[in-house]
């Protein structure tokens, strides 16, 4: 909790274009820095995965959407794929045709928008993962890293956006939320015991109003 507060403090690590490489209050922070005062995507991807492990789904979404918006804005304005971003100007910098570090952008987009994509942190291991043909049902066997104490973790599942869904783990309904139709941000229970995750479409009765 304390570390998360540091990461998302606008006086320290958090900026309008993402997480700084170093604390902005540090004496070695530079406004024209390369690695000591800029925003890169690879280290943010690792933070994003860790936030999913900690059950901090909203914070993970904040990291991913800020990165996607930053990338989209720069690409629209310059048509370039820069290495990193300067915090003060919020613009891309470094080599302008640098696609070598673009995989975090692709992974974030897929995690929140590509139907049939399942995303977890480092502590959740999925086996026997299966969607039905129209992506309205999903089942998976899930195991956890038992070297840590049991705690809530977040998993993202992109379903068919035309339906609403109920999520169960080992037969019990678990919490889920969405930022847009089809995306499920699922909060797994505080356990290290393996189990079965099921996502099923639900039908809502709509009374006749004519």
What are these regions (language model features)?
Residues 1-11, 27, 33-148:
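C-terminal capping/lid segments that line or modulate ligand- or cofactor-binding pockets
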Residues 16-25:
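Active-site-adjacent bridging/hinge elements
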Residues 41, 132-136, 159-161, 180, ...:
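Solvent-exposed loop and beta-edge segments used for protein-protein assembly and interaction
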Residues 121-125, 147-152, 177-179, 185-189:
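Glycan-association/targeting regions that enable binding to alpha-glucans and other polysaccharides
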Residues 124-126, 140-142, 157, 165-167, ...:
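Hydrophobic beta-strand residues in large extracellular and virion-surface proteins
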Residues 145-163:
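Surface-exposed beta-strand/loop patches in extracellular or lumenal glycoproteins
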Residues 168-172:
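Short strand-turn-strand beta-turns centered on an Asx-Gly dipeptide
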Residues 178-210:
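C-terminal beta-strand-rich structural cap/linker in extracellular carbohydrate-active enzymes
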């Amino acid at each position: 909790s304390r570390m998360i507060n540091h990461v998302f403090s606008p006086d320290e690590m958090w900026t309008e274009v993402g997480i700084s490489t170093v604390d902005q209050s540090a004496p070695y922070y530079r406004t024209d820095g390369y690695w000591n005062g800029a925003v890169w995507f690879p280290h943010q991807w690792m933070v994003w995965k860790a936030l999913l492990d900690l059950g901090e789904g909203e914070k993970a979404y904040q990291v991913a959407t800020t990165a996607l918006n930053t990338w989209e804005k720069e690409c629209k304005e310059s048509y370039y794929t820069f290495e990193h971003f300067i915090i003060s100007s919020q613009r891309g910098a470094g080599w302008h045709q640098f696609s070598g570090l673009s995989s975090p952008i692709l992974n974030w987009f897929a995690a929140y928008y590509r139907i049939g994509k399942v995303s977890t942190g480092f502590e959740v291991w999925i086996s026997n993962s299966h969607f039905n043909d129209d992506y309205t049902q999903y089942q998976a066997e899930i195991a956890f890293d038992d070297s840590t104490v049991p705690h809530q973790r977040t998993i993202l599942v992109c379903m068919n956006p035309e339906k609403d869904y109920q999520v169960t783990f080992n037969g019990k309904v678990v919490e889920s939320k969405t930022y847009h139709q089809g995306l499920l941000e699922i909060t797994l229970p505080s356990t290290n015991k393996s189990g079965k995750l099921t996502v099923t479409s639900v039908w809502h009765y709509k009374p006749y109003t004519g």
